[in-house]
């Protein structure tokens, strides 16, 4: 993978000049000039997904110049490097192979001279066997009862992905009830345990090292809760499984290492739902549906690896994002799913994007002179319309938005879905085209308002429009289409990291806070005044001690 400063390329300089031509061009004028604009700026994937990027402040020339940037920064070479098992996470000396976890073609993928696929397939087979036993009721707890509830204990990638997917695929859920605990705040585990029966509860402890502070604190509290009812520590083996690589620590905890599901250093946390970390998904929806999730992601992997940049969906979305972030100065992107089951999708890719590309140092170790990762946020529609869309429509910030919706609802109640989708279509139209002062004045006049009344209110009713959006319309949210959608965003993030010359797959920014917390924790053990920090931190710690 080459280390090329994008801002020093000819393509970047051409984009800067092109931006001067484009900065005042409106989306409405682009549509007025081209009645084929939708056809030119949209694409379908596998007859399951339509991506419409026509309501953006771009022309064919914009995309050509952005694709020149991808060529100059050797995106094609970087894609080959990732798929071939090269150690592109150089700060940790690791390959990046979440694509191997869903490699349904089973073609060899080699790391350090060894094909990883036999081990991947062995873990999948072990997961299937485990899921079949638990779901069928063959797996019994310490009193001989079948499992009814599963608690996934993890944090970050070991929580956000499985929680997001199990929520998104709730229509496929079986009889098992899924619970997710992540926060080290004792309230989270305490509230999760309140309705549960120790005789019928299975815990999944998800920690690669089996040392993650938050996860192991919660796991020990869960074990204490369980043993307060079960008594015999030998019973732990029937109610706890581990998603880890530390067999020694897993065994010492009381878990049978036969019920330890491994993954590898080349699986990054925020890309790990496809691995053993996804065991909670497989338990929730059944292993066959988990395999369909993998198949959907694999189909998008093939599209990403094999499709030319000008038709490559992750690449196109990535380039458009760079255009806004680095040339228009847009600092945030909103992800707005019009599907209640997808309510955790924005939070999942908030982590996926911000932890991956929230870097200020390039791959040469130098501070960058351009923008890297944007701030990602969002809520399901139509809730967001009654919360923050006001600012998107009429505020002073440019906020590119991704609107996501299924054509087919899993809950076709009355006309709910038609009303939901009418809002989906209306919002992107309103954001793009707005409402002029002339239209507002004519509307008021037709309603019989006096000129004075019109003049008093009209300016506040104007919508400038020219707010960019992508619309991603799925046929239906299925395991396959969800897998493809997640992989689409994963590869968008990777593409942006390549072009922006940063390391996408490490996360050193999470380390300093953890180090300082480990230093502060012993200081909280007694009531002595703390003086070892700055005046603010000392005062906060001492007030906490005084009040607790």
From Swiss-Prot:
GO terms for biological process: gluconeogenesis; glucose 6-phosphate metabolic process; glycolytic process. It holds the Pfam family PGI. The active site is at 355 (proton donor), 386, 514. It catalyses: alpha-D-glucose 6-phosphate = beta-D-fructose 6-phosphate. InterPro entries: G6P_Isomerase, G6P_Isomerase_C, Phosphoglucose_isomerase_CS, SIS_dom_sf, SIS_PGI_1, SIS_PGI_2. HAMAP family: G6P_isomerase. Belongs to the GPI family. Signal peptide: none annotated. Its EC number is 5.3.1.9. It is found in: Cytoplasm. GO terms for molecular function: carbohydrate derivative binding; glucose-6-phosphate isomerase activity; monosaccharide binding. The gene is pgi. The keyword Isomerase applies. This is Glucose-6-phosphate isomerase. Gene3D superfamilies: 1.10.1390.10, Glucose-6-phosphate isomerase like protein, domain 1 (3.40.50.10490). Keywords: Cytoplasm, Gluconeogenesis, Glycolysis, Isomerase. Pathway: Carbohydrate biosynthesis; gluconeogenesis; Carbohydrate degradation; glycolysis; D-glyceraldehyde 3-phosphate and glycerone phosphate from D-glucose: step 2/4. Catalyzes the reversible isomerization of glucose-6-phosphate to fructose-6-phosphate. GO terms for cellular component: cytosol.
